[in-house]
């Protein structure tokens, strides 16, 4: 499962969970609703909701759209 660091096991967090948490945090930082973010990046509101709830397996193109709308680089959405 996780790697041992200093004798302690570290739980692995999925990329989907990291992406979801980062999208939610960045969206809230901007004071945007899911609908506002969806409008800014040209995606449907339900798509954004599914990403945030970790329901969708998202394509790299859509990660880029979200990042551009949020004013960050795509890799930042995948940084724990």
Model-flagged regions — what are they?
Residues 28, 39, 68:
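Alpha-helical residues within the helix-turn-helix
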Residues 46, 56, 75:
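Key DNA-contact positions within bacterial/archaeal DNA-binding proteins
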Residues 1-30, 35:
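N-terminal flexible/basic segments that precede or flank functional cores
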Residues 23, 34, 45, 60-63:
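Helix-turn-helix DNA-binding elements, focusing on the entry/boundary residues of the two helices
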């Amino acid at each position: 499962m996780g790697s041992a660091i200093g004798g302690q096991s570290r739980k692995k967090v999925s990329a989907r969970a990291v992406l979801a948490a980062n999208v939610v945090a960045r969206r809230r930082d901007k004071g945007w609703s899911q609908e506002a973010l969806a409008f800014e990046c040209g995606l449907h509101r339900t798509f954004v909701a599914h990403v945030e709830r970790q329901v969708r397996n998202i394509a790299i193109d859509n990660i880029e759209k979200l990042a551009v709308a949020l004013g960050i680089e795509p890799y930042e959405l995948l940084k724990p």
